[in-house]
Amino acid sequence: MTLQIGVIGCGAIGQDHIRRLMRTLSGARVVAVNDIDPQQARDAVTHYAPDAEIYADGRDLIAAADVQAVLVTSWGPTHEAFVLDAIAHGKPVFCEKPLAVTADGCMRIVEAELAHGTRLVQVGFMRPYDEGYRALKRVIDSGQIGAPLMLHCAHRNQSVGERYTTDMAITDTLIHELDVLRWLLGEDYVSAQVVYPKKTRHASTHLADPQIVLLETVSGVRIDVEIFVNCQYGYDIQCEVVGENGIAKLPDPPAVGLKHLARQSVEIMTDWKERFIASYDVELQAFIDGVRRQTLTGPSAWDGYAAAVAADACVRAQKSGAVEPIAIAERPAFYRA
């Protein structure tokens, strides 16, 4: 059976997903698209899915009889309503981050899915599908380095545009660490603090950059995450886990080591999409396979809620300078499997 998918949102990410669904992945095809900009929808159809029907309203796309599953890649504030509508129609839905723009919105989705009785939602956190992070988790879970005590992490971008704001360091950037570190350790956070080093001259006047986020988990693991979105030299993701008996480090992407003209060098990526391109393929294939098996296993609506609660606390900490509590509701048994 080929899974028939409708895509809501045909911007850069949406078109990239349409491309991989039609040209790279197996077991699915795009039969419907929608975008607030009709030209974007037409472009997606022209370039990647010539047989797909264009819908003027995303709700009509969700209700369409030939749409068996939905991808939501539209503007963030629209996600909650589309996901809730997909659940109401009993259709599996893959939603790019954020699941909703507030923790309360994420909880409404959780409650709707609980009421439905089966998992329908997968959130687009792709780092758990990265082979480097998977290898790191295997080491942690094996007990080889003992219990994790500390994590030292960094999320560095070459540069960001003028529209990037201080709180986006949390909601657009750190949100990936908030999800993947929770997954690595298998536990929730209890507090967050944000401190500001000396500001780089490369940051716009309204942006605090870099920032350091300090997190504590339920068991007492301490995490520091450097966010530096105008580092100039490239796109660089680091994660070092300090355990009782050793240290495990996220591997850098493979690159050719060059010795030339009395210098030794290794190229560093500059594009975040290039760094995790394989992970996007794996996560979406996992969604397709999960829908066909009627068993979704990827990041859940609860994971989206947990990341949103932690992000809200980090934004509060940006403003207060204090250690802010992270109060996550008790996880339902539905999401513990």
From Swiss-Prot:
Homotetramer. It catalyses: myo-inositol + NAD(+) = scyllo-inosose + NADH + H(+). GO terms for biological process: inositol catabolic process. It is an enzyme of class 1 (oxidoreductase). InterPro entries: Gfo-Idh-MocA_inositol_DH, Gfo/Idh/MocA-like_OxRdtase_C, Gfo/Idh/MocA-like_OxRdtase_N, MI/DCI_dehydrogenase, NAD(P)-bd_dom_sf. Belongs to the Gfo/Idh/MocA family. It holds the Pfam family GFO_IDH_MocA_C. Involved in the oxidation of myo-inositol (MI) to 2-keto-myo-inositol (2KMI or 2-inosose). The keyword ATP-binding does not apply. Keywords: NAD, Oxidoreductase. This is Inositol 2-dehydrogenase. PANTHER family: INOSITOL 2-DEHYDROGENASE (PTHR43593:SF1), PTHR43593. Its EC number is 1.1.1.18. GO terms for molecular function: inositol 2-dehydrogenase (NAD+) activity; nucleotide binding.
